[in-house]
Structure formats: C-alpha cells, structure tokens
Amino acid sequence: MFALKFILITSFIASTALAHFTLDFPESRGFVSDIEGQFCGGFSTVGPRQPFPLGSGPVHINSHHSLATVVAFISTSSNPTSFDDFNTTSNGTIIPLASNIFQVTQGEKCFNIDLESLNVGLTNGSEVTLQIQYDGGDGDLYQCSDLVLIQGYEVPSNETCTDDASRTSNASSTSSGSATATSAAATSSSSGTSGAIKEVVGLGALSLALGIAGLIIL
C-alpha cells in the first residue's frame, strides 16, 4: 500500500513538472520543454520575423496547467539577448508591459495586445520581439516570437481573439507600465524604478495572491 501511494505521488509530481505552455500565434521561435525556463524558452537567436498588426493583434497560447499567471512584453532591439533588452528602447525610453498580468486555466487561451498604444515610437515596419512569461506554480517559463509590425495587417480569420483572457480574468496590472502596478509583484535585473519592470519574476506568488482575492478567471 505504501509503495502504491509512493508511486502515485511520484507520478503526480512528475506530471506536474512536465506541465508547460506553448505559444501558438504568433509562432514561437521553438519549443523544448526542458529549457522553457530559460530566456526566450532557450531559443536565444532571432528567427524569421512574422507580420503582426501594429495596432491590436491576437496572441494564442495553450496552457498545460490548471491555473497559471501570464504577462507579455516586447523588445525593440534587433537582437535581444537578455531581459534587459525588454526594459528600454535604444534611446532609453522605458517599454511598458504589452499586456495585463492575468490568469488562465488549462487549455487554449488568447488575448489581444496593442503595441502601437505603448507609445515607444513603433511604426509601420518596426521590428520587435514578443516574449510571453508564464508561471503555473513550478517556475517561470518563456516563449519568444520575432515580429515585423504592419499597419492595417489582418491576421488569419482563425487566429482572431474575441474571448480575451487578459480582460475577463480581472488582471492585476494594466499595460500602462506604472511602477506602482508592477513593483509589488515584480523585480528586475535593471535598477530602474519607474515604468514597466521586466523580467516580471515571482508570478507564482502573484498567482496565489490573485487566487485568494477570488478573481474571476477563464
């Protein structure tokens, strides 16, 4: 009986450890579960840039956890190599978060981001890298996608997002990037004290706090 319980507990822990997420649209640089906890999910080289709306555009993920916390942020560097590259533009302008910090349940989820509204000088043809940070309770995971922003670009009809998870989950922070909204839940390798702070670490603690607060989630 003890052996059976041990096997069941071990199996549960193993299955939990294997739970991850995928970035399905825009397409991720790549996915290897064992290295998803690294910067850009372990894929540090810029890939082919995909067209993406300069204005509002959809992001689709597949969550493998029963509950997880998600946030999106961007870099305007042509070759981002660290989280610092997602903090400021080349002229020192602080880059706000690209999404709210929000929660999702297991399954396919989507949310919309409006990169033009970040007011960091993005225009038609701007090249950015989108990074998604995801925490299902067993550590932060990451996925990156390299984009070229197109004014008026229409995504395929099957990729639109009408059930926006970042809005229906009563997100804890807005994309305005204010330090007040993010500092309680985030730290950074950067010493800046204003604007968005990335990487947003400690999402697990934030998930717990949001759960206790009784947020409405998808």
Curated annotation (Swiss-Prot):
Keywords: Cell membrane, Copper, Disulfide bond, Glycoprotein, GPI-anchor, Lipoprotein, Membrane, Metal-binding, Signal
A GO MF term: metal ion binding
Disulfide bridge partners, by residue number: 40-144, 110-161
InterPro entries (UniProt xref): BIM1-like (IPR046936), BIM1-like_dom (IPR046530)
Propeptide residue interval(s): 191-218
CC cofactor note: Binds 1 copper ion per subunit.
Leader sequence residues: 1-19
Residues binding Cu(2+): 20, 65, 138
Protein topology in the membrane: Lipid-anchor; GPI-anchor
Residues bearing carbohydrate: 87, 91, 124, 158, 170
Highest taxon in the source lineage: Eukaryota
One Pfam family cited in the UniProt record for this chain: BIM1-like_dom
GO cellular component, one term: side of membrane
Sequence ranges of Low complexity compositional bias: 167-194
Family the UniProt entry places it in: Belongs to the X325 family.
Name the UniProt record assigns to this protein: Copper acquisition factor BIM1
